[in-house]
Amino acid sequence: MKLGYACINMQLSYPTKYGDKPKGTESITTGRSMIKRTFESKGVDYASEITLANAKDLHNIMTWNVLNGYNFYRMTSGLAPWKTEYEWNDLKDIKEIKQWLHSAGTMANTHGVRVTSHPGPFNVLVSPNENVVENTFQDLTMHGDVFDFMGLSRTHYNKINIHCNGVYGDKEFAMDRFC
């Protein structure tokens, strides 16, 4: 059995509350993000800075997981905020982001840590709304890209769980859309 957890390491995210660190200790988290208004005003360069900080901390979290015997980790879906609005190569820090992600992936692969992700409920492949389906493809592609940057195997061992959600009044039609 592999012991693990989903997304937020409470001890690292809140080191003074759940850990043994003094006040003022910086949290380690991959959940940094921004609201749309901030993205619109600060742009892709700020998204790059956030993504880089998240990638560095993913490495720190993976190191902590290995040192503490956690062999399963479900990654955040928010590693790269507003990723559907830009391409990876638009990020000024993409080279360093990829290096940190690869380092985290190497740590996981070397120590047998199973890494998965679970994109949010707004990703709906069976939606009758083509925009929703297209956005879902973009988001799932982003998750796959991150796994590729990490060097994770493309197997069931490193899953990207997806929501099927809703039949929209016609189960057969929804199944056809999904399959």
What are these model-predicted stretches?
Residues 1-114, 123-134, 144-145, 149-152:
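Alpha/beta catalytic barrel-like cores
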Residues 134, 140-179:
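Eukaryote-skewed repeat-based solenoidal scaffolds used as protein-protein interaction platforms
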Residues 118:
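Conserved, mostly hydrophobic/aromatic
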